[in-house]
Amino acid sequence: MAVGPVTGMFKRRIVTDFSVTMILGTLGACYWWFGYHKPAARQREEFYVKLAAEKNAE
């Protein structure tokens, strides 16, 4: 009983690897953007608003 040749495995593997890479990269970028960058930028902006208010109060 002969088994036919396996075709399309390389192409399927490349597509799968690319898809998984893009999904994980996007999830990582979203985690960094909303988990680190946005809170840090908000904190920085609040600091400068407070600093400007103190400077204007003088």
Curated annotation (Swiss-Prot):
Transmembrane intervals: 15-34
Protein name: Cytochrome c oxidase subunit 9, mitochondrial
Disulfide-linked positions: none
UniProt source species: Schizosaccharomyces pombe (strain 972 / ATCC 24843)
Family of the protein in this entry: Belongs to the fungal cytochrome c oxidase subunit 7a family.
Major site of localization recorded for this protein: mitochondrion
GO MF annotation, one: oxidoreductase activity
Alphabetical keyword list: Membrane, Mitochondrion, Mitochondrion inner membrane, Oxidoreductase, Transmembrane, Transmembrane helix
One GO cellular component, as annotated: respiratory chain complex IV
Mitochondrial intermembrane topological intervals: 35-55
Positions of the propeptide segment: 56-58
Record flagged with keyword Membrane: yes
Pathway: Energy metabolism; oxidative phosphorylation
